[in-house]
């Protein structure tokens, strides 16, 4: 959520930043009008409450002096009714103001390139050379079905479209990738966590999924809980409504969880294989940083994600998302895209973002530089490290052999119990 003080002091700056996201900037004027109205109503109620208190003292004094206080009592009742009326109006104005504020995205960083959509994202790095096959390469969904590593048909019977059973060596490869990713991040200083995979609405609000993106979520109506779309949600909310001490920063968490997404609006896209699922496993990184350190932390986090693909020796590229493609809560984002031969293209496998104080303001996560200092908002960051299913697909496609087998990447052999080939 954006700071209302920024609207008051730098409205043109806010308009400029929102315009970069193609958002109608008249919302800034609407928010300022509501803010002025709310402050005027607040001032009026404070005046009336002061008047009521003074009148109450007068009534008490009259009663002590055995004087008639009827007029003062009547006046105090009228003031009380006026306070109730104004409080009702203030609550309505304040709620309208909040509703508008919480639906506005973060302001993009000066380092975020300007652009209208994904076609204007900027490539900042490319690593590795896509493999040239001397045979007809197959898509991962065909390879894994031939090797009995996955069963999409039975998953559709059990759950519906966009689900998969991973079986035999498929299940083993998935687990190997999870453990390899977690071990890599632990070596990079991240604390491993096991998180809840059902969270409440306050948690979803804190990280920005609610209220704007509710249609993308699965909800357990009876309990009022949501399945997590990413472990960013529980990891970030771990410190919700808390004040951290200076020595707690930076804090770096990593977790592997199942993630659940309705994929609203993606009908017809990536309908085969493991690329776009309702349920998938993902290793996540989350960081809590001092504001002055958060952009350097983003570079470091992105390197952690990239290092997974480098150790697997799979080509990738890193792009800086432009202002028209960047996520709702992010100020700056890098997407890491892995090479998938079946698409003859790079596909997103990680998104690493600096959310600055956007989530921290919603979730009320603060820190103190020393015990006597004023509490400040932390900066939060999150990044995939990596999406396990997409990494699985990338390994299968990039390490496929002409006879239909898959060579196990060298770094995964210990995690596969010494197995070097899946056949």
Curated annotation (Swiss-Prot):
Pfam families: Seryl_tRNA_N (PF02403), tRNA-synt_2b (PF00587). Its main location: cytoplasm. It is found in: Cytoplasm. One of its GO terms (molecular function) is catalytic activity, acting on a protein. CDD domains: SerRS_core. It catalyses: tRNA(Ser) + L-serine + ATP = L-seryl-tRNA(Ser) + AMP + diphosphate + H(+); tRNA(Sec) + L-serine + ATP = L-seryl-tRNA(Sec) + AMP + diphosphate + H(+). It is an enzyme of class 6 (ligase). It comes from the Bacteria. Keywords: Aminoacyl-tRNA synthetase, ATP-binding, Cytoplasm, Ligase, Nucleotide-binding, Protein biosynthesis. GO terms for biological process: selenocysteine biosynthetic process; seryl-tRNA aminoacylation. The keyword Manganese does not apply. L-serine binds at residues 230-232, 284, 384. InterPro entries: aa-tRNA-synt_IIb, aa-tRNA-synth_II, aa-tRNA-synth_II/BPL/LPL, Ser-tRNA-ligase_type_1, Ser-tRNA-synth_1_N, SerRS_1_N_sf, SerRS_core, tRNA-bd_arm. PROSITE patterns: AA_TRNA_LIGASE_II. ATP binds at residues 261-263, 348-351. Pathway: Aminoacyl-tRNA biosynthesis; selenocysteinyl-tRNA(Sec) biosynthesis; L-seryl-tRNA(Sec) from L-serine and tRNA(Sec): step 1/1. One of its GO terms (cellular component) is cytoplasm. Consists of two distinct domains, a catalytic core and a N-terminal extension that is involved in tRNA binding. Catalyzes the attachment of serine to tRNA(Ser). Is also able to aminoacylate tRNA(Sec) with serine, to form the misacylated tRNA L-seryl-tRNA(Sec), which will be further converted into selenocysteinyl-tRNA(Sec). Homodimer. The tRNA molecule binds across the dimer. Belongs to the class-II aminoacyl-tRNA synthetase family. Type-1 seryl-tRNA synthetase subfamily. This is Serine--tRNA ligase. It comes from Macrococcus caseolyticus (strain JCSC5402). The gene is serS.
